[in-house]
Amino acid sequence: NNIAAALTASANPTFEVTIAGGRIRQEGRDVLGQQVEQFFSAYKVDFGLFGVGGVDADGSLLDFTEDEIRARETISQNCRTKVVVLDHTKFGRAAYVRGGHISDPDLVFCDGEPPEEIGAMIRDAGHELVTAGDDSAALALLPEFAEAGE
């Protein structure tokens, strides 16, 4: 539901990108609203990628609006592999609406190591944490993406 991500993905000639209609949140260029929930409910996809506004010390995934949470929950319910992509500034960042836990996504991609407690929550759930610079691990986890990029 992010316009920038859709444009980046569309640069790969082997990808077909379909985007949802709805209201654009200017700050993150996310498309939000009931149309987004209806759109994602109509699909069952291999990978659901999403970001978060923040991650609390207890592992709660946080965002700034209920619309963002509902979009993320709908994407999560309609994909086989849940992938959260975030940067280190999200850890401890205050946001107001809780929706999910850091141990929920199957894969967590981050630009660096998360706080030790957060990393333990991910690993204890049996899920993968991939940090920047760990390209071989990322490609091994997502072979479909590796093949598409060749």
Predicted regions and their residues:
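Active-site-adjacent alpha/beta core region of enzyme catalytic domains
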Residues: 1
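Conserved phosphate- and dinucleotide-binding cores of soluble alpha/beta proteins
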Residues: 4-150
